[in-house]
Amino acid sequence: MRDELLAAVDAARDEIIELCQALVRVPSINTGVMPTGNETPAARILQEKLAADGIASEILESAPNRGNFIAQLAGTAGTPRLLYLSHTDVVPVEDEGAWTHPPFGAEIHEGRIYGRGSNDMKNTVAAEAMAMIILKRAGVPLRGDLVFAAGADEESGGKWGFAWRAEHHPEKLRGDFGINEGGGALVQAADGRRAYLVS
């Protein structure tokens, strides 16, 4: 199965790149001052992409245009539950004239996608979405649930993103394990459990 999945990833290379480019083209700039963010268009791109492979999802708006995306592949036992965690907002473009390539052009030069968010972290958002799609296409039997959550407002503290979701939809974020961009720190959950982030 491993070799088949790796071959499926290779076969989906162009699709992964195109999804990343589509996400980078969304100017989901988070200044930290409302109204800001514009994450809902990125969430809609994800929703359409996953729906094409029969994966249902939701966009939960914490405020107008502050879309928090979530999708799930159900496992046979439900647990352990693995969360893919990422965000679709980006930091502001301070001096567009200093950019070699347009910040929301998602142009490819020398094998790299250039644009705001191409490294933090729309590349990971695209990879997580496509990992879920490839697992679904391959018919991989999952024991536990796989949840893909791409949040708003990470670049400005998370009030309209994962913090909002944890307050209003905590059941959608429950998990046994999570894969995120961070790592190395001890964190304490609201219920008192502690965990180390591993990167």
For the regions a protein language model found, what residue spans apply to each?
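Acidic/His- and Gly-rich active-site-bordering loop/insert found
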Residues: 2-116, 137-143
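Acidic/histidine-rich catalytic neighborhood of metal-dependent amide-processing enzymes
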Residues: 119-199
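Solvent-exposed, charged interface segments at domain starts and junctions
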Residues: 1-11, 177-180, 186-187
